[in-house]
Amino acid sequence: MHYLDISFTYKNTDISVREKLAFDSDEKKEQILKLINSNKNIKESMVLNTCNRVEIIASVEDVKAATAHIIRCMSIFSGVFEDELYERADIYENSGAAHHLFAVASSLDSLVVGETQIVGQLKNAFKFAYDNNSCGEDISKIIHYACKCAAKVRNETQISKNPISVSSVAVAKAKEIFGTLEGKTAIVVGAGEMGELAAKHLISSGAEVIIINRSSERVEQLVDSLGDNASWDSILKLKEYVNNYDLIFSSTAAPHAIITGEIIEPREFHRYFFDIAVPRDIDLLNTELISVYTVDSLEEIVRKNLALREEQAQKAYSIVGQDTSEFLKTLKEDMSVPLIKSIRKQAEICAKNELEKAIKKGYLKHSDYDEAQKLIHQVFKAFLHQPTMKLKGLADEERASELSNGVKFLFDIKDEQNFQAGDIDEI
């Protein structure tokens, strides 16, 4: 088994391509996972989809064949040519996949380093794949360690102190433009997670917020939680709001743009649109009186954030490196456990059979059986110590699979039993 992570992020893929790759509905995610898992080289898979990244995480039998299949599946769904996907993708396997995923979970690979949303998004992506029978023990193990690593980074560094997100960066840019947001009214389109964060940051900066949403139930609850500086209205009045206010943030789950040139009317004041959705909500060109900022165009503030957190990021990467090594060590031992257990079980059965023969033939008294069994156990425990240590180190050897198969042949082991690392006592 090999771990594989095929990654498309803001670093290697611009937003115009990322939005084509976005699996922005449960139906799309379910379809892509079924298609990916239809190949014999894929054991398990999950898809992580955020505004800044689309990643396929999988456990596979053959890395090259599995990569080709996954790229082909993504090309079918997105309409992007396979050659372009290969050119853009960062492809990680085994230790590289673990290190990358741990860094992602710890928000070190995020556009906004230190943002706190990613670990929740990772957990939700795993839960969706698990609930849809797309992943199991292999991916469960690496996600568990990734979340554990993220918690350690959060607790042992200050990288998430004063946590920020894409939404907060967008609000910071608005403050930079206007000087202050005190007394301003901002329009937030969408009441999802990103919209909620934008509204909170706007209100904390002194602005009043009007949230525009399709469903009344969700937005009513949100407005109640935000207090007196928040109100809401129907998405049916979107045209009215985008033409009468100068500060608009949009983050809906719509599969297509909802703010287009068709609903924009000429005005004599400058309007600023912040599109923090992927796929994009806003399809407008920058003009003399209209400025549009997307996720990818907030880089200057992001760079400042990265510089401020550089020292903490170095500490965090050290933790990621340590946790990656620990995970690989555990994985290595887990891989050898069934084989080790099978050899020990075979030795126990052989010893028991010989003891029973000795008693039947009168070579050994019944009263000596327990003592003889203890002695034999100690003998084969000592005898198997060195082979056990060697087997636990097989994952570090280039010929690990070949050596493991050789051991199975020598001991005539047909089927290894499924045990966990905790089942093996220290020998």
Swiss-Prot record:
User: Which positions make up the signal peptide?
Assistant: none
Q: Can you list the disulfide-bonded cysteine pairs?
A: none
Catalytic reaction list: (S)-4-amino-5-oxopentanoate + tRNA(Glu) + NADP(+) = L-glutamyl-tRNA(Glu) + NADPH + H(+)
A Gene Ontology biological process in which this protein takes part is:
protoporphyrinogen IX biosynthetic process from glutamate
Per its UniProt record, what Pfam families does this chain match?
GlutR_dimer, GlutR_N, Shikimate_DH
Q: Which CDD domains match?
A: NAD_bind_Glutamyl_tRNA_reduct
The entry's protein name is Glutamyl-tRNA reductase
Gene that encodes it: hemA
